[in-house]
């Protein structure tokens, strides 16, 4: 039986994940928070909803900005990693692997997903500004 090559997703374990995004004055803060929580498995959302840190700041032109940040460590971080791997489409997983050299630094994997799609409970890699930033700290096996 032919052995399948290992990929980033199958050969790595996440020990920590940091999710962050911002809500501008024109955005509904509740929807932005929902989008952030939609990134994690449904079974963990209630547990971590109260752990989201909120920071209010001002933009360059004095516009109010709310920054949301959630840090998860341990086994739940790996559960989130696997959930995201399964939730991304095959094309997005391949794109991440093909751009790995610009996404991986010192065992940290950087991914940006569309905030709009996350609100709709779909994950899509997005390189624009309206994103949820995801930073995984990985412990990796060997990738073929």
Each PLM stretch: what is its role?
Residues 78-109:
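Mid-chain, well-packed structural core segment of small domains
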Residues 46-75:
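Short, charge-patterned binding micro-sites
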Residues 27-31, 76-83, 120, 144:
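Short, conserved charged micro-motifs
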Residues 1-47:
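Long, hydrophobic N-terminal alpha-helical segment
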Residues 21-25, 40, 72-76, 115-117, ...:
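Beta-strand elements of well-folded, non-transmembrane domains
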Residues 17-23, 67-72, 107-111, 132-137:
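Short cationic amphipathic helices and targeting signals
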Residues 105-144:
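Glycine-rich, aromatic-bearing surface loops/beta-hairpins
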Residues 39-44, 88-92, 128-131:
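A common structural junction motif
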């Amino acid at each position: 039986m032919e052995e399948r090559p290992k990929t980033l997703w199958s050969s790595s374990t996440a020990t920590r994940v940091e999710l962050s995004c911002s809500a501008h004055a024109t955005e509904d803060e509740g929807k932005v928070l929902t989008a952030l929580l939609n990134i994690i498995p449904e079974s963990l959302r209630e547990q971590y909803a109260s752990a989201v840190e909120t920071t209010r700041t001002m933009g360059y032109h004095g516009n109010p900005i709310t920054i949301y940040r959630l840090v998860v460590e341990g086994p739940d971080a790996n559960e989130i990693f696997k959930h995201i791997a399964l939730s991304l489409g095959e094309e997005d997983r391949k794109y991440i692997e093909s751009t790995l050299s610009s996404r991986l630094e010192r065992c940290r994997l950087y991914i940006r997903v569309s905030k709009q799609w996350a609100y709709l409970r779909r994950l899509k890699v997005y390189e624009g500004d309206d994103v949820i930033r995801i930073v995984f700290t990985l412990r990796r096996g060997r990738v073929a």
